[in-house]
Amino acid sequence: MQKRYPSDNIKIILGGGPKKTEGWLNLDILPIPEVDIVCDLNQGIPLPDNSVVAISARHLLEHLDDTVKIMEEIWRVAKPEAVVSIKVPYYASMGAYQDPTHRRFFTEKTFQYFLPHKEHRTVPDYHFRAEFEIVSIGYIWSARWVRYLPFKSFFRRHFLNIAKTMIVELRAIKN
């Protein structure tokens, strides 16, 4: 049985597992006490359209079957201007490939697919209807000393294991 949470400011964590955050609903496939709504996110997000003001997906997208489908679901449940925070293994990190349950790999270009301005795309438009704005892209570096490297952008693009995680903040665009 799923709990009901009446609120105008619903915030959700997708795939939060045992990590409970005060004030946020935790949606996960695991039926454990910290999970508020047990669901398979491959099948969608069991919340109404335009009902969520903030969405967090930490190390989840790489495990799901269809990135486009989950992004459409995130957009569907997001209110206009909702903030979406995504944390994924960076494609050039060993951790991205080490885990055999990872189905997808992510770069900065991955999230350009979801921009409203289609000229940023280098791949065909498959009639994706959800639109996001990229607010910021950041990284968690593989070692402390990397913070002090000059030209981090160059090293990140041309060498393995400089950045281990990419953090992307998006904003849902709805008319």
Task: List where the protein language model places each region.
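Conserved SAM-binding loop
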Residues: 9-92
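Conserved alpha-helix/loop element of class I SAM-dependent methyltransferases that forms part
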Residues: 1-9
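Short secondary-structure boundary/capping segments
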Residues: 3, 28, 158-159
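S-adenosyl-L-methionine-dependent methyltransferase catalytic module, highlighting the catalytic core
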Residues: 68-69, 75, 79, 83-175
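A generic fold-level signal
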Residues: 6, 19, 162-163
